[in-house]
Amino acid sequence: MDGSGNGPDDRRGTVVNGPQQGEIWWAEAEDKRRPVLVVTRNEAISVLSSIVVAPVTRTVRNIPTEVALGAQHGLSSVCAASFDNLQPIRRVLLTSRVGRLGIDELEEICRAIRALADC
C-alpha cells in the first residue's frame, strides 16, 4: 500500500471527483491512514455523509468474504478487502483515490456481500 503522494490521484486532503463504488481510497482514521474499498452504491454516495467501505488488509485469508486486490488496483502489495469488517466512514475522511476495480471485477463486491450474508 503505497501512499507515496506521487500518483496522479494522490492529492492528499482533496476529494478528486468524489468516491464511486469499486474504488479504493485512502481513509484518514482516528488512529491511522488506511486504504478502503467503497461499497455503497453510486446513486447514494453524493447524498450521504457516511458511506460503507470494506477495509483493505495485507492479511489475505482467501475466503469468500474477501475481494482480492493488488498492484493492478494501485496497491503496492497483495491485499484483500475484508467484507467481514464492513464499516461506515464519513465521506470527508476519504482523502485520495488509490485505484479501482475493473468493470469486470465489480461483481466481486456483490459476491462478497452474498457470502457475508450467507445468501
What are these regions (language model features)?
Residues D2-G13, N17, H73-C119:
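C-terminal terminal-subdomain/extension
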Residues K32-A71:
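Compact nucleic-acid interaction/catalytic patches
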